[in-house]
Amino acid sequence: MKEQLIPIQWKDDALVLLDQTLLPNEVVYESFNTAEGVWDAIQVMKVRGAPAIGVSAAYGVYLGVKEFVESTEAEFIDEVKRVCAYLATSRPTAVNLFWALERMESVATDHTHLSIAQLKDRLLEEAKEIHREDEEINRQIGEHALTLFHDGMGVLTHCNAGALATTKYGTATAPMYLAKEKGWDLKIYSDETRPRLQGSTLTALELQRAGIDVTVITDNMAAMVMSQGKVDAVIVGCDRVAANGDVANKIGTLGVSILAKYYNIPFYVAAPTPTIDLKTPTGKEIPIEERDASEVINRFGQYSAPKESKVYNPAFDVTPHENVTAIITEKGIVKAPFTENLKKLF
């Protein structure tokens, strides 16, 4: 077992991120000292995964205001709001981003009696608390998910909802790590996840380093693997869950859910409660980020299609709640009717 890769660290008053765009070929950590640097890291996906984005943005708020020298507390609070609004533009789909920024802004608006120096300290402590909470949430999700698994089963996952997408354990991968700790042998199938290949470059990498049995398959092999009886369950992460249980996750998740339903394979979604957005009624209202065409036709510096090709590149799709067997949160396992049962978590 190799040393675990740590995606997010706070060191020497700076945010240290593992540059995930370079994996699996290079392991490079980069320090960020400004909100602008954090914004760019989120946008170009040096850090990715809804929980990790939220934690990074929280630190980004502190970095954006730590050098503030204006004279009044009111001006400082306005600057906190400005930095939060700026960081919110980095990526539109992951609700954890907005949840974390709302928490950071509330620190300022709810403590107007504090001095600027005290507010800065409170902002940093809140960012660290969001960081700590995420690690505990991941373990709790894993413990609940493990009750649905058994030794020797085959599990398919899509994209990376692992330790690299969070702060430790991951969400969808948390039961895989805990199963390893129990001495279980799970057989993991990881979709490569076109076009950015997070399943092969990230999920396979971190599971291999942890000594977990993982096999990489292309996205269009999932049906074959399921038809051969090799998959007993599917578990994925998510970037947002609507109030009715519709799930926004990495592009391709919808197709996996349809296949799982056809082959009568349970389809589980690992979802920290901050990703559950009761203000969004259904998946139709979730904004879907579209990314650059180069990710599809020029991924490795060489064109795989005519340069002038029209390209449609949504980063996420929405899986309807009818395809979801259960949503696994740190507070427990939620099953249909989701509209009613998700509310009970709050």
UniProtKB/Swiss-Prot annotation:
> Which top-level enzyme class is recorded in the Swiss-Prot or TrEMBL entry?
isomerase
Enzyme Commission number(s) of this protein: 5.3.1.-
Provide the GO biological process annotations: L-methionine salvage from methylthioadenosine; pentose catabolic process
Q: Mind telling me which residues the site (Transition state stabilizer) is annotated on?
A: 159
Q: Which gene encodes it?
A: drdI
Q: Does the keyword S-adenosyl-L-methionine apply?
A: no
Instruction: Output this protein's name.
Output: 5-deoxyribose 1-phosphate isomerase
Q: Which SUPFAM superfamilies match?
A: NagB/RpiA/CoA transferase-like
Q: What PANTHER family does the annotation carry?
A: METHYLTHIORIBOSE-1-PHOSPHATE ISOMERASE (PTHR43475:SF1)
Supply the source organism for this entry: Bacillus cereus (strain ZK / E33L)
| Record: residues binding substrate | 48-50, 91, 198, 249-250
